[in-house]
Amino acid sequence: ITNSITKRTKACFEPSIDYIVVKFPRWPFEKFTLADRSIGTQMKATGEVMALDRTLEGALLKALRSLEAGEGYLHLKKLDGQSLYDIRCLLSRIDNERLFVLAEALRRGIEPEEINRITKIDLFFIYKIQNIIRMERRLLKEGLTEETLKAAKRIQMPDPAIAHFAEISIKDVENFRKKFNLHPDYKMVDTCAAEFESYTPYYYSTYSSEDEVKPQGENAVIVF
């Protein structure tokens, strides 16, 4: 069986993946405010988004923006006023806000091991979210520099979040990106890490040092 993407490899060819995919459910609870928000075996999501990036942190933050709900970032404003005790209690609840509670717990200094004990979420994922929180703290401490901007964009932190933590305006962040010529590149989605040519390529944006998009001719069409 020939791989329909590369046209050169077979179905028995072991895939080599150089990107991460995050699928995130879309919950309808903002419309059904009285509905039970607990998550279990019953289907409650009304849709989902899928995001691709070179890092898990970046794919997660992309997915949150794609939901077009709330703040579009790993933060819930209503958690700001909760006490540390309340945050620990909320961690034990399995609902649509659990990921945001987890991030808030890390902001408050609760150790990943304690979060793992309460939630049973694998430490691998908790550490990845902790990387995002560490970037927030770095921006708060160091402000916006070429180095911190590149590090923040490497994990797909959006401009409004960077502006908030660096305590500057969104326009300043945009000017910094232009000053340092920092813009997203486009990588090809295939199953062979670009080892073979892909005959049905599609792309995702990421902040790296190499663009894999090739001119397709005068009559090329871009589909978003």
Regions found by a protein language model. Give the residues of each.
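ATP-dependent carboxylate/acyl-activation modules
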Residues: 1-224
